[in-house]
């Protein structure tokens, strides 16, 4: 994924990604930055994975607004790997369980446990 024979700790690389992962807490932040940057379209909707797994069912109005922002973004950009209430699970387990992530894939995600 790095296009190199070897990488070392601390080295910065430009990795070829198989996908990205966001959840109901981090995706709204990414959406705001996406919009601030002036983007109209996502590069590859098939590589975007959004899982509502932290505050669903929603615990309060803020959580409901965050979920709504994710739903709107997924619908606007035809993101097929959007996992809403009733179709979601723990994001780190869900992607491998659904066959979206397989051995050797390189996925980045906006969550503290993404290394799983």
Feature names for model-found ranges:
Residues 1-116:
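Fe-S-dependent hydro-lyases/dehydratases of central metabolism
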């Amino acid at each position: 994924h790095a296009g190199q024979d070897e990488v070392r700790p601390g080295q910065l690389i430009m990795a070829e990604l198989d996908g990205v992962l966001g959840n109901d807490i981090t995706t709204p932040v990414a959406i705001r930055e996406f919009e601030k940057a002036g983007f109209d379209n996502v590069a590859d909707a098939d590589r975007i994975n959004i899982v509502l797994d932290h505050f669903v069912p929603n615990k309060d109005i803020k959580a409901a607004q965050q979920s709504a922002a994710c739903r709107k973004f997924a619908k606007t950009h035809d993101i097929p790997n959007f996992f809403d209430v009733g179709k979601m699970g723990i994001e780190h387990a869900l992607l491998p369980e659904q066959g979206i992530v397989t051995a050797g894939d390189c996925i980045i995600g906006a969550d503290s446990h993404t290394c799983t």
